[in-house]
């Protein structure tokens, strides 16, 4: 899979071009008959999106998503409320613009020459490639030359259809595919995972997130190069909304808000490891149930699933784990640390988890208050791994190299330098295995994503099974004699539960959220 690339130079050039085009519309607050004025008069910014872990999702009643958070900030910027409408596929999104039911589309949509003829793009803020996926264990196509419509299905409105058409005309005359008008990209990915479909095409970020919960999903080949992602609005003579978007994105880029949100949703990396992910999910099924209550009991300052992910990174949930340097137990505590925490047995699961949680809380309390709340945990984890003093060195080095010491994105890039003599020789606390601390934090983030998604998926499956049981409750022999059991209906409804359903990070939401 291609490395995700956030090209700020490219974004800057496009933003300048957009600014030149929109210059007559700025300042936009002064106009009365314009899109921004209409939104402010209504008091609501209407945004249409699709349900995905990157764009918009509701988990345990809380809303998440890169596009959701940006849309909420933009609504605040305009001084209005945000109204999110979730659609099934991309075609329905553009229908909302055409029918006047949405002001903006914020759904990880790719900038495309065909789209910009009909719709107004906004600033570009990250990029993806389109990739063809298949299920591990099935035939992997090495080229599009032999792919047929019986194998490849695309969601309606998908930008890749234009690319496929060009490839068919120029390179692969036998290439064919079909479009399923009733399914979105998320559902088609599920179909590939469940063996109902040979291939589909999705963007690289969506695929990497799916793989954290479904390691059996594999990338066969890249269909496109990197493509910038943007929001879309209606294309007409009034550019006030586009001008407002430009001003908004410039402001969050300058104050670091954009980088923090991108780090939150895109910073987990894309170096997917099938074997490691599969082993982790097996441990979730077989080992975690014995430890779950302890993680929940002692995770006071953080989500218990994050504490569990830390423990897996430390010991693979082995209470007897011991390293060559002498650290031991589920949280791999040193003897000195254990003594300072009042622990008597590092291999005791409860003592280790309680001690590790308290030690992490101490690290979080030491993180400077200037660090944003949602990034403090990553600084604390780096300190947990390599020591608080070396984390201070990493911040100091970030300042010396013109970075922001309060930005995890900037600081983590300097961590590997702590093991290089030209850098550590000039730092207060000297040499540190900064590259290990970098990998440590990144691995924990990946395990956390997998754990959250996998557990939510299991909860969904249990809820669906309970509903099925309620629809078809157990009957007495006398009742069975009165009427035959509706096997056909039962099988048709239960077939979807025989394999893994999608993660709740990908669970379809209500059609409209206010």
Curated annotation (Swiss-Prot):
Task: Give UniProt keywords alphabetically.
Answer: Cell outer membrane, Cell wall biogenesis/degradation, Lyase, Membrane, Signal
Q: Supply the name of the protein.
A: Membrane-bound lytic murein transglycosylase F
The record lists the membrane-crossing segments as none
* EC number per UniProt: 4.2.2.n1
Question: Where in or outside the cell?
Answer: Cell outer membrane
Which InterPro entries would you find in this protein's record?
Lysozyme-like_dom_sf (IPR023346), MltF (IPR023703), Solute-binding_3/MltF_N (IPR001638), Transglyc_AS (IPR000189), Transglycosylase_SLT_dom_1 (IPR008258)
How does this chain sit within the bilayer? Peripheral membrane protein
Q: Which family does it belong to?
A: In the N-terminal section; belongs to the bacterial solute-binding protein 3 family.
Q: List the disulfide bonds.
A: none
Q: Name one Pfam family in it.
A: SLT
Q: What does this protein do?
A: Murein-degrading enzyme that degrades murein glycan strands and insoluble, high-molecular weight murein sacculi, with the concomitant formation of a 1,6-anhydromuramoyl product. Lytic transglycosylases (LTs) play an integral role in the metabolism of the peptidoglycan (PG) sacculus. Their lytic action creates space within the PG sacculus to allow for its expansion as well as for the insertion of various structures such as secretion systems and flagella.
The organism's place on the tree of life at top rank: Bacteria
